A protein has these predicted regions:
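A short, basic/flexible loop-to-alpha-helix module at the beginning of a structural domain
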Residues: 1-11
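Active-site cofactor/cluster-binding pocket
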Residues: 10-20, 25-237
């Protein structure tokens, strides 16, 4: 069984795929601090970098749970997978380590109503076969609205906390903003406020869509099937 694990179910295992220049690793390091310092959970993080550094891909491996985490290896069976760059779906097997029923969060430049047709066929099949809970947000649109250019790190971090439920939503937002102030405070209040605005926008249900994929009704993939159903972020099942 490729998804067999000796780790207890109480350990949340999350993978984040990003680029060296998009701030994903920095945001995940902040998330570890938030989870480890502000909850009863223990937290662990490993970070894998492509040799090209800036502009190349990064993979963040985060674990957290109610007991000390002793695992000293990379995650091969994840309950949460986030892809912060749509183009990585063609380059990496992003969902290989996703457990059946896991959450998949995707930053997509396409509207939720179109994103299914834009996915590589293999990714469509994995979502169906593994019955993944699929969420999509246009992080770049939110970043642009907040005046942050291409920096999506705090936006995707907010989505992670909104979906994972590791902290109550408002408490998570408060902790994220505190981390933002510590991280970006030296750059000036304008930078801090732009990040705050991005967090406030990303937490809104209208931004983060849960695609209710009709598993079992899908017969033909990519190009012949347009996923019809989107909803505001409500239940995660």
């Amino acid at each position: 069984d490729e998804h067999f694990s000796t780790e207890p179910d109480s350990v949340v295992r999350a993978l984040f795929y990003g680029l060296g220049s998009d701030g994903t690793v920095g945001a995940n390091k902040n998330s570890i601090k938030i989870i480890g310092e502000d909850t009863d959970n223990f937290a662990q993080g490993y970070f894998v970098y492509d040799s090209k550094k800036s502009g190349s891909y990064t993979i963040s491996h985060l674990r957290f749970g109610p007991k000390p985490i002793k695992s000293s290896y990379l995650i091969s069976n994840a309950s949460f997978v986030a892809c912060h760059q749509f183009t990585l779906l063609e380059k990496l097997d992003v969902l290989k380590a996703a457990n059946p029923g896991a959450v998949f969060l995707l930053n997509s430049p396409y509207p939720a109503a179109e994103v299914w047709d834009r996915l590589p066929r293999k990714v469509q099949q994995q979502i169906i076969d593994k019955k993944l809970k699929f969420y999509v947000i246009d992080g770049y649109a939110v970043a642009k609205e907040a005046g942050m250019g291409q920096r999506i790190n705090t936006i995707m971090q907010t989505c992670f906390f909104a979906i994972s439920g590791v902290l109550p939503r408002e408490e998570a937002i408060e902790r994220i903003k505190y981390a933002i102030k510590k991280t970006y405070g030296k750059r000036g209040e304008i930078v801090v406020q732009k990040n705050f605005a991005a967090v406030d926008e990303a937490k809104e249900p209208a931004q983060l869509k849960h695609l209710q994929n009709a598993v079992g009704d899908v017969r033909t993939l990519r190009g012949a099937y347009r996923h019809p159903n989107t909803c505001r972020m409500q239940a995660f099942h």
